Amino acid sequence: MANAIIETAKERFTQSHHSLAREYASIRAGRANASLLDRIQVDYYGAPTPLNQLASITVPEARVLLISPFDKSSIKDIERALNASDLGITPANDGSVIRLVIPALTEETRKELAKEVKKVGETAKVSIRNIRRDAMDEAKKQEKAKEITEDELKALEKDIQKATDEAVKEIDRMTADKEKELLSV
C-alpha cells in the first residue's frame, strides 16, 4: 500500500514534467518550431479545431514555418486564427500556403521570455509540492487507520520527500535549459 502512494506520486510528477515540457515548447525561442502552433485553435465550420489537424506544418528554414492546409478553403480561417493568437507573428498567405517568419528576438524580449519561463517553472514546482502534500496526507491516513506503523510512516514520508526533491530538481534543469536556449543569441 505504501508503494502505491509513492508510485501514484511519481506518476503525477511525470505528468507535471510532461505538462511543463509542452508549455516550454510553446514559448518561442527565435527559432521555428512546429510546437509553437500546438495551442492554436481554428474555427473550422463552426467548430474549434487544432491547427495541426487542418494542415501540415513544416520548418523549411531555421526561422520559417510553412503551413499547408489539407483543405485549401480553410486557409482564411487558419490565417484569422493565427492573427488572433498571442504569437505576435503576422502570417503571409500566398493562396495555397501560409508562411510564418519568426522574427529574431531582441534582448529585451529574450529577458521577458526568460521571466515567463521562470514563472511557469515556479508554477510547476507548486504543482509538485501539492502532489507531495496529497501523498503525505494519504500516508498519514493509512497510519491513522493502522494500515501502516509509525516507523513505516516516517520511512514513507522520507521516500516521498526524496521523490519530490528529484522532481523539483528535474523542473530546475528544464527551466535552466529553456532559459539558456532563450538567452543564447
Swiss-Prot record:
Keywords: Cytoplasm, Protein biosynthesis. InterPro entries: Ribosome_recyc_fac, Ribosome_recyc_fac_dom, RRF_sf. GO terms for cellular component: cytoplasm. Its main location: cytoplasm. SUPFAM superfamilies: Ribosome recycling factor, RRF. One of its GO terms (biological process) is translational termination. GO terms for molecular function: ribosomal large subunit binding. Transmembrane segments: none annotated. It is found in: Cytoplasm. Responsible for the release of ribosomes from messenger RNA at the termination of protein biosynthesis. May increase the efficiency of translation by recycling ribosomes from one round of translation to another. Belongs to the RRF family. HAMAP family: RRF (MF_00040). This is Ribosome-recycling factor. It comes from Streptococcus equi subsp. zooepidemicus (strain MGCS10565). The gene is frr.
